[in-house]
Amino acid sequence: MKNIIATVILCLAQCLPQSAQAQQKASPQRTIILMIDGFGEDYYRASAMPHLNQLEKAGIYQVVPSLMPAVTNVNNVAIATGELPDKNGITGNVYLNPATEKEEYIEDPALLLAPTIFERAKKQGIKTALFSCKKKTIDLMGGAADIKLCPECAGAADSPWAKQFGAPPDVYSKEVSYWIFNAALATLKSNPEVGLVYIHTTDYPMHTWAPEEAESKDFLHHLDNYIGKLQQAAPDAAILITADHGLNHKSLCWDLEKACLSRNTPIKIAISPEKDRYFKHHRGMGGSSYVYLKNQADLAKVSQSLRALQGVEAVLTKAEAVKRYHLLPERIGDLLVLGDKRTVFGNLEIAESEELGEHYRSHGSLYEAHVPLFVYNAKQAPAAAYFKYNYLLAAWLYQ
């Protein structure tokens, strides 16, 4: 009898921890990922954000490099996959399709070469939700999400969220981010089985207002209130926050195709990785450019012409760009041109260059490639030293 009791006790001692581990694996901590588009540290420090301040003090906080080019697709997809562009395949908002030799927006999920966090979660039986202000985010990386919503998505105007919070606001507004937050909050409250909620706001306010302007402060104060509501709605959840890029005022734009042509060093095409369908944000102009040559023999002459332009800070060969920024060589130009803090590149209708107005703001350069990163209440998170880049924010989850 004593032997039987001892055997039972030993079995319980061995089996209970395994059962607890199995339960932990089956039901990991709920997680909220917030990607605040365009949220440089200057915006954070200029605004009253007490809830975010509290997360900073209670968790991990640091300013980290984002990825180049400093545009949304490159960084959002890297955050969602936990992989660099040479592994996930996304090198901009647009690319030159080698099959058609035409510039095309990067929206097709077939271009994605690495699994997303939604796919990783699904393999572990975890339900997920993706809420984004931008349809391209849903199209590109939301395929495996169980719940997905954007204001331009089919059915959004007739969705339960629209009935509860009104019709989706215009994408060129502050309110569109609030609408997305309300939908995410409602989901957290009514669908506790959803283990991962990913929220992506818009950078329209940052393109429109500088950090010190009242409208910018108002927008971020509203976002901070929503962060507080997220904590209240899911006090058990880990909250992971970062950004894709910052923003700066830009005063000069070069049309590199026209500039090279007028200097007798014509090129095939120059593509701004920042260009997307949200033309009102930035007019398709950004602080970096992929330049494709007509002939490889033109490389030295074209590089010389580009380096001589005011505001051009660096001209890298494809090999240099791939090595320095971990880019996929098949989806970038023969050259990568980088602007200084005040210079952007894009297509201009008439002249080869244009002086930009005092309110024009954009990104894409190294000067927008540092962002805040917050990790709060994440029970299984790595130590602070792990988070060397923004794309590592959630790379450790569901592995």
Go through each PLM region and give its residues:
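Positively charged n-region of N-terminal signal peptides that target proteins for export
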Residues: 1-4
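Bacterial N-terminal signal peptides
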Residues: 6-15
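Boundary at the C-terminal end of the N-terminal hydrophobic targeting segment
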Residues: 20-22
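Metal-dependent active-site segment of extracytoplasmic phospho-/sulfohydrolases and closely related
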Residues: 33, 51, 219-266, 337
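Catalytic metal-binding/acid-base residues of hydrolase active sites
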Residues: 39-40, 202, 209, 245-247
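Short, structured active-site-proximal loop/turn typified by the sulfatase FGly-forming signature C/S-X-P-X-R
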Residues: 44-87
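His/Asp/Glu-rich, glycine-adjacent segments
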Residues: 84-210, 298-301, 307-311, 394-398
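Active-site neighborhoods of enzymes that stabilize oxyanions during catalysis
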Residues: 275-399
